[in-house]
Amino acid sequence: MSYAKVLGATNRQDGYLEGNGYLVSWCIGHLVELAPPNVYDAKYVKWSIADLPILPEKWQYLVSASTQKQFGILQKLMHRPDVESIVNSCDSGREGELIFRLVYQQAGCKKPVSRLWLSSMEENAIREGFANLKPSTEYDALYNAALCRERADWMVGINASRLFSCLYGQPLAVGRVMTPVLAM
């Protein structure tokens, strides 16, 4: 991991590296995801046109079953007493912003966050990036754009899949990206 090398965090632990006063860890894709419909209301276990559309009033999130271990490691690291602040070094883009912020929120962390924004993983670029960290708030619009995309995809996927599955009588997966790609 290039960040760890540049920072001198070379002592490998379970799910992170530590050294030189730094902890370096990672996300494995989307560790935190939107809850399925049945979390909002048990009636959604059964698919019925009468229950559509499903439009959550307050969005709920769950830690992905496949990433619970790494989420637990991140949560524990965020709450360590010797950790004063956190650097979001997830991918530079809206999905990286979303991935980090959902983990941070789900972990219940309140520590200050800075953003590392890189277009290169070369050592010099990493050093320069760490020397020029930005306040996380400068990326709020990017995070909000990612939230909108995620929630729109969820609503289209859940509602359209259930509608067409009920009409067709067999399970069908419908989604914003899937449908145009299949139509090509």
What are these regions (language model features)?
Residues M1-E150, W154, P180-A183:
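Intrinsically disordered, low-complexity regulatory segments
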Residues D153-M184:
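Prokaryote-biased recognition of long, low-complexity C-terminal linker/tail segments
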